[in-house]
C-alpha cells in the first residue's frame, strides 16, 4: 500500500514510495504478509533454494549449480527456523505456524537488511506463537525486524519498542506498558 503523502526513507536516503516491489526487494527489504505463500508441492529445502538470490533467468536456472556457500546458507536458515529435520517434507504438509516459519526462512535466504512481517502469529496455536516470538528475537540479533501485529500478548513477549499507529499517525511510542497506558 502506498501512502497518500510523505516519504518513507530506507538507510536514510532512499524514498521507498517512489520504487516498485522489485527494486524494494533489491535494496534488501524482505516482506512477509499475513497469509503464508509457500510452494506447497515442493519440499522445504526446495522452497528455500527457490528463494536464494541467484540468476532466475531461463539460462541461469537451467545451468545453476548450487555452491557450497549456498548449501551452508540453506543449512543455517533451516536451523534458524527450526525445520532442519523436516527439510525433505513437502511444504503443504506443514502446520500453519511451520509454513509461516518457512516463509520467514525464504526471506532469510535472500539475506535482507530489513524484514517487514505482517501479523506473523495470526491463526497460530499458543505454542507456535511463543516459538515465533523466540524465532523473531533470534533473527533480530542480526537483522532489523519490523512487525505489524494486533496480538498484544505476542508483542509483549517480543519485549521491543512499540509504535502505535492510527490511520498513518503515530499515537504513542515506547514499551508495551507505556503505549498501553
Regions inferred by a protein language model and the residue ranges of each:
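Helical segment within the ABC ATPase nucleotide-binding domain
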Residues: 129-141
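ABC ATPase NBD Q-loop/coupling interface
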Residues: 7-27, 62-65, 178
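ABC ATPase "signature
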Residues: 173-174
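A short, surface-exposed alpha-helical micro-motif characterized by mixed small hydrophobic
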Residues: 155-157
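Conserved ABC nucleotide-binding domain
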Residues: 17-18, 77-98
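Catalytic Walker B motif of ABC-type/P-loop ATPase nucleotide-binding domains
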Residues: 115-119
Amino acid at each position: 500500500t502506498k501512502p497518500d503523502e510523505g516519504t518513507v526513507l530506507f538507510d536514510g536516503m532512499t524514498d521507498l514510495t517512489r520504487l516498485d516491489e522489485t527494486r524494494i526487494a533489491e535494496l534488501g527489504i524482505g516482506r512477509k504478509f499475513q497469509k503464508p505463500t509457500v510452494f506447497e508441492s515442493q519440499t522445504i529445502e526446495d522452497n528455500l533454494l527457490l528463494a536464494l538470490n541467484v540468476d532466475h533467468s531461463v539460462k541461469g536456472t537451467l545451468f545453476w549449480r548450487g555452491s557450497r556457500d549456498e548449501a551452508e546458507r540453506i543449512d543455517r536458515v533451516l536451523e534458524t527456523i527450526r525445520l532442519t529435520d523436516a527439510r525433505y517434507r513437502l511444504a503443504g504438509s506443514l502446520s500453519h505456524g511451520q509454513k509461516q516459519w518457512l516463509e520467514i526462512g525464504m526471506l532469510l535466504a535472500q539475506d535482507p537488511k530489513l524484514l517487514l512481517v505482517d501479523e506473523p502469529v495470526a491463526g497460530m496455536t499458543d505454542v507456535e506463537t511463543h516459538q515465533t516470538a523466540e524465532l523473531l528475537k533470534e533473527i533480530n540479533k542480526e537483522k532489523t525486524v519490523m512487525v505489524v501485529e494486533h496480538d498484544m500478548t505476542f508483542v509483549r513477549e517480543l519485549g521491543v519498542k512499540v509504535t502505535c499507529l492510527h490511520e498513518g499517525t503515530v499515537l504513542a511510542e515506547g514499551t508495551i506498558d507505556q503505549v498501553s497506558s
